[in-house]
């Protein structure tokens, strides 16, 4: 049931929601992934130009500013930025934002429940693929969810220095992810395919989650490469011992979306305080302050 404070969706909006349940999510995603890899010369350059114009992509931030410099749409979509395009906050007590986009939700984790949108919440256990022990670590903690729109830079960075403890691939649905659907599809973020990364940091245990969506062709990390495809029907888990530890620095790239979606960060109770300016809909960029050490 929808929250009484929310407007009921219109007829066309209800059709849009219903379509999410019946469309061939996987086949659309596979097709989009195949198309995005093709190198069709001037045709590819023309498509990239149309996309950049439609979504107002700022090409002046990119290392390669000309459309002709991108051999495929994938290459364009995960384009690196100029080194000076994003400044990483140098305050040692601050954690920085991992992605460009807008705040979808942020705040306090009520016991083991996170807010997805007004009227919709989801559980930590569901989000973390049934890992009850991991979920307990974040009871009464803090969280931040960042939505990456098509125009945004789609590489994901580290909020702080960290050591990778565990990575979990979770198969799932491929619903489209955007603010409207977050309000109308229950448990969307805990149902979609995702990659969960668990880190040890001086700010306590931190989780950073890459959430997939329709036409998210792949998600990758700098230590493991492309995680999907191939897509598995089972949860996969990798643990990292001291011998195989992956050390990452604040602001360092940790992963990327090829056509992207959402990044979720989880923090333990009484470890950090989210920055005051963060609120639903606020635009954010890599390197800006996410939270401060308590």
Swiss-Prot record:
<feature type="active site" description="Charge relay system; for autoendoproteolytic cleavage activity">
    <location>
        <position position="261"/>
    </location>
</feature>
<feature type="active site" description="Charge relay system; for autoendoproteolytic cleavage activity">
    <location>
        <position position="100"/>
    </location>
</feature>
<comment type="similarity">
    <text>Belongs to the phosphatidylserine decarboxylase family. PSD-B subfamily. Prokaryotic type I sub-subfamily.</text>
</comment>
<dbReference type="GO" id="GO:0004609">
    <property type="term" value="F:phosphatidylserine decarboxylase activity"/>
</dbReference>
<comment type="function">
    <text>Catalyzes the formation of phosphatidylethanolamine (PtdEtn) from phosphatidylserine (PtdSer).</text>
</comment>
<dbReference type="InterPro" id="IPR033177">
    <property type="entry name" value="PSD-B"/>
</dbReference>
<comment type="subunit">
    <text>Heterodimer of a large membrane-associated beta subunit and a small pyruvoyl-containing alpha subunit.</text>
</comment>
<keyword id="KW-0670">Pyruvate</keyword>
<keyword id="KW-0444">Lipid biosynthesis</keyword>
<protein>
    <recommendedName>
        <fullName>Phosphatidylserine decarboxylase proenzyme</fullName>
        <ecNumber>4.1.1.65</ecNumber>
    </recommendedName>
</protein>
<feature type="active site" description="Schiff-base intermediate with substrate; via pyruvic acid; for decarboxylase activity">
    <location>
        <position position="261"/>
    </location>
</feature>
<keyword id="KW-1003">Cell membrane</keyword>
<keyword id="KW-0456">Lyase</keyword>
<feature type="modified residue" description="Pyruvic acid (Ser); by autocatalysis">
    <location>
        <position position="261"/>
    </location>
</feature>
<keyword id="KW-0443">Lipid metabolism</keyword>
<dbReference type="InterPro" id="IPR003817">
    <property type="entry name" value="PS_Dcarbxylase"/>
</dbReference>
<feature type="site" description="Cleavage (non-hydrolytic); by autocatalysis">
    <location>
        <begin position="260"/>
        <end position="261"/>
    </location>
</feature>
<dbReference type="InterPro" id="IPR033178">
    <property type="entry name" value="PSD_type1_pro"/>
</dbReference>
<keyword id="KW-1208">Phospholipid metabolism</keyword>
<keyword id="KW-0594">Phospholipid biosynthesis</keyword>
<feature type="active site" description="Charge relay system; for autoendoproteolytic cleavage activity">
    <location>
        <position position="157"/>
    </location>
</feature>
<keyword id="KW-0210">Decarboxylase</keyword>
<dbReference type="GO" id="GO:0005886">
    <property type="term" value="C:plasma membrane"/>
</dbReference>
<comment type="pathway">
    <text>Phospholipid metabolism; phosphatidylethanolamine biosynthesis; phosphatidylethanolamine from CDP-diacylglycerol: step 2/2.</text>
</comment>
<keyword id="KW-0472">Membrane</keyword>
<dbReference type="GO" id="GO:0006646">
    <property type="term" value="P:phosphatidylethanolamine biosynthetic process"/>
</dbReference>
<keyword id="KW-0865">Zymogen</keyword>
<dbReference type="Pfam" id="PF02666">
    <property type="entry name" value="PS_Dcarbxylase"/>
</dbReference>
């Amino acid at each position: 049931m929808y929250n009484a404070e929310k407007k009921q969706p219109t007829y066309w909006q209800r059709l849009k929601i219903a379509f999410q349940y019946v469309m061939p999510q996987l086949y659309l995603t596979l097709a989009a992934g195949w198309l995005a890899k093709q190198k069709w010369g001037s045709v590819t350059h023309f498509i990239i130009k149309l996309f950049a114009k439609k979504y107002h992509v700022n090409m002046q931030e990119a290392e390669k500013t000309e459309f002709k410099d991108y051999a495929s749409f994938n290459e364009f979509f995960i384009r690196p930025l100029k080194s000076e395009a994003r400044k990483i906050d140098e305050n040692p007590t601050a954690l920085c934002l991992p992605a460009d986009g807008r705040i979808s939700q942020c705040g306090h984790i009520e016991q083991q429940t996170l807010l997805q949108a007004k009227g919709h919440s989801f559980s930590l256990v569901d989000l973390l693929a049934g890992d009850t022990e991991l979920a307990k670590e974040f009871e009464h903690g803090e969280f931040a969810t960042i939505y990456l729109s098509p125009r945004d830079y789609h590489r994901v960075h580290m909020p702080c220095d960290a050591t990778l403890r565990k990575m979990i691939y979770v198969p799932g649905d491929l619903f489209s992810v955007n603010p409207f659907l977050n309000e109308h599809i229950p448990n969307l973020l805990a149902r979609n395919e995702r990659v969960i990364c668990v880190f040890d940091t001086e700010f306590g245990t931190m989780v950073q989650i890459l959430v997939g969506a329709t036409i998210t062709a792949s998600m990758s990390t700098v230590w493991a490469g492309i995680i999907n495809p191939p897509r598995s029907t089972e949860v996969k888990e990798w643990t990292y011992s001291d011998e195989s530890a992956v050390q990452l620095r604040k602001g360092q790239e940790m992963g990327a979306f090829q056509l992207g979606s959402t990044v979720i960060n989880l923090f333990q109770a009484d470890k950090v305080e989210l920055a005051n300016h963060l609120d639903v809909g606020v635009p954010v960029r890599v390197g800006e302050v996410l939270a401060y050490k308590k």
